[in-house]
Amino acid sequence: THKLQLEGLFGPAYYVTTSKELMESGTLANLSIKCLVLDYDKQERQMVSKMSYQEEIDWIVRNEKRNNFIKNLVSDLKGNTLVLFQFVEKHGKPLYDMLDKLDRKVFFVFGGTDAVDREKVREIVEREKDAIIVASFGTFSTGVNIKRLHNIVFSSPSKSKIRNLQSIGR
């Protein structure tokens, strides 16, 4: 629901505390955000600039060099890592197949994964030190609390501020 609609119904928002204050008090874990911007060659940039938004997203998630970069990034990260994706067949499954070849426990969670199995994955990862969860935004961006999660990799582009903030809150 839009912020202005909520304010119209309930009045202005009252902020009791901030994320910074919660981190300083130890209620929230400290976090560090590292934004990596990939540089594509001129020919690729020109080609993509002529695409519609949906075609561009499709090109991004199917880009083999980009997905290989994500695989290498995740393999270099220490600790439990959550890799979030948007499209199961064209992005999540290929990423899972690439990451599953690593010498680490790798789990694949999407809308078709039974709720009991999702909970088992969460419990297993909380006992692990170096596991990888490849999960769709829809299943792991909201409502899931993983206590021993060290890294989140947003492998799919998302313009949604709320989705991004909720995903970071895992």
What do these predicted ranges mean?
Residues 1-34:
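Post-DEXD/H (motif II) to motif III coupling segment of the RecA-like Helicase ATP-binding lobe
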Residues 11, 75-80, 100-105, 129-130, ...:
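Short glycine/proline-enriched coil/turn segments at helix->beta-strand junctions
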Residues 27-29, 75-76, 123-129, 144-146:
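Conserved catalytic network of the ASCE P-loop NTPase/AAA+ motor domain
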Residues 29-49:
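Conserved P-loop NTPase
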Residues 45-86, 90-101:
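Conserved interdomain hinge at the start of the Helicase C-terminal
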Residues 82, 91-94, 104-141:
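Conserved helicase ATPase core of P-loop NTP-dependent helicases/translocases
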Residues 159-170:
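Conserved SF2 helicase motif VI
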